[in-house]
Amino acid sequence: MEYSKEFMVRLKEEITSDEGVKLEVYLDHLGYPTVGVGHLIKDTDIEHGQGEGYKITQTRCDELFYQDINICLSECEKQMNEWEHFPEEVKLILANMAFNLGITRLMKFKMMFAALNSGDYKEASIQGLDSRWAKQVYNRA
């Protein structure tokens, strides 16, 4: 699925605001090496094995972000039957949640998806906010 430049810019702005940007390798709250906009370093990344404090450029940060967000959007398309019918605002919210939670955990929001799939966005919002995730990430939610 193609996304407009405006959609991608807004998604990047929102996720960057929520996740923060770190241009050096750090350990996340679980002790995993991470860099950029919450990018979990993989064995195939050039940053792998470099250790905490290894610096990357903003260009590399953007590259990693777009790799991650394209995977995230692809997973949303595959897992959510109604994805293409959701309004852009809903897609932005769900993509942000998927980026933060991972698609597997996001798909456990059964009541929220029931409301979304029936077009009841107010109820979907209530269901999304009535979760442990929303309490943990208060301002983001």
Located regions from the model:
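Long, amphipathic alpha-helical surface segments
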Residues: 1-24, 39-41, 62, 66-67, ...
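Catalytic glycan-binding domains that act on GlcNAc-containing polysaccharides
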Residues: 22-29, 85
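Structural recognition of the beta-strand scaffold that forms the well-ordered cores
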Residues: 14, 34-36, 93-96, 123
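Alpha-helical segment that forms one wall of the substrate-binding/catalytic cleft
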Residues: 48-82, 88-108, 121
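Substrate-binding/active-site groove segments that recognize
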Residues: 27-51
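Residues that flank catalytic or metal-binding motifs in active/ligand-binding sites
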Residues: 11, 29-31, 90
